[in-house]
Regions:
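Bacterial N-terminal signal peptides that target proteins for export
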Residues: 1-8
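Mature extracytoplasmic or organellar-lumen-exposed domains after removal of signal/transit peptides
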Residues: 22, 27-250
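Bacterial N-terminal signal peptides
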Residues: 9-23
Length: 250
């Protein structure tokens, strides 16, 4: 069965479930304190749908993979599609394709999408390792550091470089974290970096490296606090500064 057939099956499944979906679906609330626009929220859902569909295709064609990965990522794609349709029903958007295209060339919108997806990477990575605290909450960095404080003091190097010796308890979440890191790299390199102000070149170069570091950390199963360090101390602050992202006023 080729890719087009797989996508056809998924789209059919989407249409059936979306038609019967409950209008009271709860939306994900992004834990970071950026003020998220409606367009950024829509684009984030679209990128999540695309990422989960990519995983369905990847594990469907892999001869040594189990059907469980295909099923789980298909379920995720359906859930995100339902959330997208629920959100569209509550908005005045007439053409989602136009919103998506425009968003890719709006630096503020796209920077918010990247920030959202980075939060989703943390959530999935935390779930993959059965971590009970919220990785997207910056204050939990203190808790994470204390949990491994003795190890870090004896090793003499940054927690960011330390490999996680634990085995993932949810491989599907780990797979999602991996593919989302690819999405973030692609969006930043192909679209967002070129939209930055000229005087922010040094910051953009550092941001590019930090996004690469995040991908490396995920692929090499670095401890969760290492990912938190990259995101909360580097990626999010640089996104905010370079693209003038606004914080939520509480």
């Amino acid at each position: 069965m080729n890719r087009d057939i797989v996508l056809g099956i998924l789209l059919t499944l989407f249409s059936i479930i979306t038609y019967n979906s409950c209008p009271y679906t709860n939306y994900e609330v992004y834990a970071h304190n950026f003020s998220v626009t409606d367009d950024a929220a829509l684009l984030t859902l679209i990128e999540q749908i695309k990422a989960e569909t990519e995983l369905v295709n990847t594990y469907f064609v892999a001869s040594n993979s189990s059907n469980s990965s295909v099923i789980e990522h298909a379920k995720n794609a359906v859930n995100f599609t339902n959330s997208l349709n629920d959100k569209l029903r509550q908005s005045t958007v007439a053409d989602i394709t136009q919103v998506y295209t425009n968003g890719l060339y709006n630096s503020t919108t796209l920077a918010l999408v990247v920030a959202n997806l980075v939060d989703e990477i943390l959530r999935n990575y935390g779930s993959a390792y059965g971590i009970t605290y919220d990785l997207t909450n910056m204050s939990n960095m203190v808790m994470a550091t204390m949990l491994h404080g003795n190890d870090n003091s004896s090793s003499g190097h940054s927690i960011m470089l330390e490999k996680n010796n634990a085995v993932p308890v949810n491989m599907y979440n780990y797979q999602t974290a991996q593919v989302l890191s690819n999405v973030v790299n692609r969006l930043f390199n192909d679209k967002l970096s070129g939209q930055a102000p000229v005087n922010e070149k040094v910051k953009i170069d550092n941001l590019e490296q930090s996004i690469k570091d995040l991908k490396y950390a995920i692929n090499n199963k670095v401890r969760a606090e290492g990912l938190m360090e990259i995101v909360h101390m580097k990626i999010h602050p640089m996104l905010q500064s370079a693209y003038d992202l606004k914080l939520v006023v509480r």
